Amino acid sequence: MALTTEEKKVVLGEYGLHETDTGSPEAQVAMLTKRITDLTEHLKTHKHDHHSRRGLLLMVGRRRRLLKYVAKTDVARYRTLIERLGLRR
């Protein structure tokens, strides 16, 4: 379920502040969102994979905390990030 290096480069190139950015909240949230969508697709076919389900819940919680931090520090950045990722419909 891990992302390949190419997938990481695509996500970080699109959402990172610069090419090698991996630590900004936007990059971290984008990476978590990609992993969450991949894991959600996996769980649709493997309904009894409870170990992965727990990992999914941990990732969702981490993403929620990062989004809370971005919203607290810069609301405009938060709104653009939410809109770009397609969260909070």
Swiss-Prot record:
InterPro entries tied to this protein: Ribosomal_uS15, Ribosomal_uS15_bac-type, uS15_NS1_RNA-bd_sf
Alphabetically ordered keywords of this record: Ribonucleoprotein, Ribosomal protein, RNA-binding, rRNA-binding
Domain of life from the UniProt record: Bacteria
UniProt keyword annotation of Zinc-finger present: no
GO molecular function terms noted in the UniProt entry: rRNA binding; structural constituent of ribosome
Alphabetized SMART domains for the sequence: Ribosomal_S15
Gene3D superfamilies reported for this sequence: 6.10.250.3130, S15/NS1, RNA-binding (1.10.287.10)
Pfam families the record matches: Ribosomal_S15 (PF00312)
GO biological-process terms attached to the record: translation
GO cellular component: cytosolic small ribosomal subunit
Coiled-coil blocks: none
rRNA-binding among keywords: yes
PANTHER family: RIBOSOMAL PROTEIN S15, BACTERIAL AND ORGANELLAR, SMALL RIBOSOMAL SUBUNIT PROTEIN US15M
Functional summary from the UniProt entry: One of the primary rRNA binding proteins, it binds directly to 16S rRNA where it helps nucleate assembly of the platform of the 30S subunit by binding and bridging several RNA helices of the 16S rRNA. Forms an intersubunit bridge (bridge B4) with the 23S rRNA of the 50S subunit in the ribosome.
Family of the protein in this entry: Belongs to the universal ribosomal protein uS15 family.
Assembly and oligomerization: Part of the 30S ribosomal subunit. Forms a bridge to the 50S subunit in the 70S ribosome, contacting the 23S rRNA.
Name listed for the protein in its UniProt record: Small ribosomal subunit protein uS15
Taxon lineage: Bacteria, Bacillati, Actinomycetota, Actinomycetes, Mycobacteriales
